[in-house]
């Protein structure tokens, strides 16, 4: 995965609560085994009308949000069934960072595991960001190393992130590459196993 130390991009607001994984990526698109190409299916039932045309009423279809890479979402984002396809779809759509008051736990972890940064934001700070960015085409900088958001008005908002996931994102590690970093320690441990444990 690519390291994520700091990111500057346009922020889009999807101020809906309880957006579940079936709304993020509908179940009929889960048959593919590749991790790429899911972006065109993200929010499919909201993005397109019955004729397959873009729905002009859907928030993320608004011209001001085109090219957004930061999503300001509502409470309990990513709830519902566990599917890793949900962060795949959001990442392929172009989002690198998701800011919300709360996330479903499994979705929250899946974002980190797939190189995305989900930020749990206290409600008052989140509401402030929604007020700034709703229906606007504005940039935001998210500094993961210093755990700071620099908003469009020059304010700094701090955020919390688990040290383990922070290290993973900053260094671009996935679970396999992190395991390979410990290869020598693993070999040493295995060499010290009691003989009766050997197959």
Curated annotation (Swiss-Prot):
Q: Lineage, please?
A: Bacteria, Bacillati, Bacillota, Bacilli, Bacillales
Q: What is this protein called?
A: 3-isopropylmalate dehydratase small subunit
GO MF annotation list: 3-isopropylmalate dehydratase activity
Q: In which pathway does it act?
A: Amino-acid biosynthesis; L-leucine biosynthesis; L-leucine from 3-methyl-2-oxobutanoate: step 2/4
Q: Which domain of life is it from?
A: Bacteria
- Catalytic class of the enzyme: lyase
Annotated keywords? Amino-acid biosynthesis, Branched-chain amino acid biosynthesis, Leucine biosynthesis, Lyase
Record Pfam families: Aconitase_C
What is a single cellular component term in the Gene Ontology annotation? 3-isopropylmalate dehydratase complex
The record's HAMAP family line, in alphabetical order, gives: LeuD_type1
Family per record: Belongs to the LeuD family. LeuD type 1 subfamily.
Function recorded in the entry: Catalyzes the isomerization between 2-isopropylmalate and 3-isopropylmalate, via the formation of 2-isopropylmaleate.
């Amino acid at each position: 995965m690519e390291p994520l130390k700091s990111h500057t991009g346009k922020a889009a607001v999807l101020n809906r609560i309880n957006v579940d994984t079936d709304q993020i990526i509908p179940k009929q698109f889960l048959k593919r085994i590749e991790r790429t190409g899911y972006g065109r299916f993200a929010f499919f039932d909201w993005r397109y009308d019955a004729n397959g045309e873009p729905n002009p009423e859907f928030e993320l279809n608004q011209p001001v949000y085109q090219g957004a890479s930061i999503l300001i979402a509502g409470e309990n984002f990513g709830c519902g069934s566990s599917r890793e396809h949900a962060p795949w779809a959001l990442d392929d759509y172009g989002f690198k960072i998701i800011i919300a008051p709360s996330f479903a736990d499994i979705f929250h972890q899946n974002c980190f595991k797939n190189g995305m940064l989900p930020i749990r934001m206290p409600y008052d700070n989140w509401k402030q960001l929604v007020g700034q960015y709703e229906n606007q085409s504005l940039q935001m900088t998210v500094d993961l190393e210093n755990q700071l958001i620099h908003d469009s008005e020059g304010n700094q908002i701090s955020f919390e992130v688990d040290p383990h996931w922070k290290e993973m994102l900053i260094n671009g590690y996935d679970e396999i590459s992190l395991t390979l970093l410990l290869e020598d320690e693993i070999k040493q441990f295995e060499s010290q196993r009691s003989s009766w444990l050997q197959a």
